[in-house]
Amino acid sequence: MKRYLLILLILIAGCAPWVKIGGLYTSKPHNFSVELPDGWMRFNTPDRLYITRDGVLLQNILIERLHIEKSLKHTKKKFAKGMLPQEVADLVLDNISSDPTVLNFKVIENIPARISGSPGFKVVFTYKNKDGLRLKSMLYGLIVDEYFYGIRYTAACRYYFDHDLKTFEKVFGSFRLIKTV
């Protein structure tokens, strides 16, 4: 019986999705590297890297890479090679605002930005979730080769957004594409 309990505990521990992080994180399959903050937790999916310190509903940083031929979840629209950064920003904002869980969506800022030395965009927006929690996001995005890269920080407007903004800025500043055309 003890042996089965030990095996069960090992299996459960092996399935734990959140991993404590800190330092350089490199994803060769996703073609990027980034410095992750000490003490935060990481969760990977096939297209995304999530990190949080206090829980994804309070604050999270998301780094995603999507193939441009993949339809966006809420609008079913696709990116195209050669799109201008502002066109990419408009497509992304349209997709986010079409999410039924995003309420009272408001764009605060939408400007050009450089990301890992390449032209991209920066958008800042607020919204409420279905529970009425007011959230603020800062999203940088660009298309390189056949992929869209997005680096997004989302946090509760009250306390968390301002509290962890410098951490996000450090993460964003360390983001590097491993290979570019």
Question: How should these model regions be labeled?
Answer:
Residues 4-13:
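Sec-dependent N-terminal signal peptides
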Residues 12-30:
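Bacterial Sec signal peptide processing site at the extreme N-terminus
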Residues 30-90:
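Secretory pathway targeting signatures of secreted, lumenal, and periplasmic proteins
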Residues 38-40, 55, 125-129, 139, ...:
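A mature extracytoplasmic/lumenal domain signature
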Residues 40, 147-181:
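Surface-exposed amphipathic alpha-helical segments
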Residues 43, 95-99, 126, 171-174, ...:
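Structured segments of extracytoplasmic/periplasmic soluble domains
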Residues 55-57, 116, 142-148:
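Short, solvent-exposed coil/turn segments at beta-strand boundaries
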Residues 86-142:
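Signature of long, low-cysteine stretches enriched in small and polar/charged residues
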